[in-house]
Amino acid sequence: GERPRRFVTDVVRDHGARPDGSADAAPAINRAIAAAGERGGGTVTIPAGTYRIDDIIRIGHSDVVLRGAGSGATTLYATRSLTELIGVYGSRYGGDKSSWSWAGGLIWLCPKERWASLTEAIRAREWPFEGWTGNRRDDWRTLATPAPARRGDRTITVPGADARRLRRGRLVLLRLADDPGHTLLQHMAGDGEGARAYAWADKTKLTSYAPYEWPVRITGARGRRITLERPLPLDLRPEWDPRLTTLVTPLTGCGVEGLTLEAVEKPQAPHLLDQGYNGVAFQCAYDCWADDVTVRHVDNGFGLIGASACTLRRTKVEGRGSHHPYYCREGSHDNLIEDFAVVARTTPAPPGTQLHGINVEGLSSYNVWSRGRMEMGTFDSHRGMPFGCVRTDITVNNNGVHGGDGSAGPLFGARFTHWNIRVVNGRAGLMRIDGLAPYSATVGISEVREFGQIDVPDFTGDLHTRLEAYGSPETVRPANLYEAQRGVRLR
């Protein structure tokens, strides 16, 4: 028989939004999104025009797509910050920092219940954890205890009694806890001599990021053998108490397409004191996306917060300058950011501000940035030891700085790759990483020299790195590592 028609609702025709900016359109847009969610999914269309929004646009049900008429045609004009709309958001690590400097969005994709518990905690000034296991990281239960396995395995073995709970299509969380000797962190850093000698114990922010939590969908279950959608990111060793667990109800199959989010233009705030004029945030989201989306005059552009298997395609950050044009944190894994742009700022940077760039931190792993144009910013490995990430086919004016305090640990874990990177201002910092990142590859990078922010390696001894085609990115084949790897996988 015929497939049922997907539910479609229009914010102007069906919900009374005005496309001339004369009235607050947020209630109409959120009503339309809720209507789609209540029907099990659907598409919310926003015709060409400018829509004033005085509230957050929230996508909290799976399989809902918010679709404008194109980033050059549909504009959402945001008038208020997250501080005004939700409240002050302090840091769970203390001090007077504003967590809106790295969290939340004026378009916010997050499961309805998770968003409610998160914002309730913020209003109560409890400064929550932000990921897949709730505000205190205790919202989970064990489904299975897998047998030892190796990084890269797609099939794992679980006890027979556990296997009955692991049906095909179920989304589960792989949980790996560190041990007193911090051998899990050593493994993330490549298990080299430098990782074994590193002083992990006093890196209290880094150690707070463990356990490592990796969401994955089950694609096959036959007896005790469970097949996963993606290869294991790390070994499964008994000393790390590996478990497959439940997780908060995820947001899946949601997208934002064909629009510009423009915040009211206010001067950029001093570093770490952002009010939260933020762009699009994906939180506890799996297999969600943005396509043809521009954000303008924002504090922070596109955020991945405990998000996995999401794709940002044809996205752009422009306007008066931002703190994090793109950020990827709180254990975000397996995401793709491609055909992206960070456009040069339209006003000079105020004193006391910082520009990062394409950020990754907080034990986030296996993320890819591909086909980018960065007229400002840097490759912001923000400590917190991200690992296994690829940056490829990017042109960058390397004028940003990385962040991250010392208690967050190393800049890089193992297996970073920078491939075909064209550095127009010749600055080495965070571009050429053969002297910094263990088990890394720097392939086809422009000739660069050290100036500005200069880093020293976190790990002693041989880093086991590769430097190839230095000074001649135009000769590198394939020109785009991600596309080549994807082609091999699909064959």
Task: Show the residue positions of the predicted features.
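Residue-level marker of regulatory loop/turn positions in helix-turn-helix DNA-binding domains and
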Residues: 21, 207-210, 248, 274, ...
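Short, T/G/N/S-enriched strand-turn elements that build extracellular solenoid repeat scaffolds
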Residues: 30-37, 52-61, 66, 76, ...
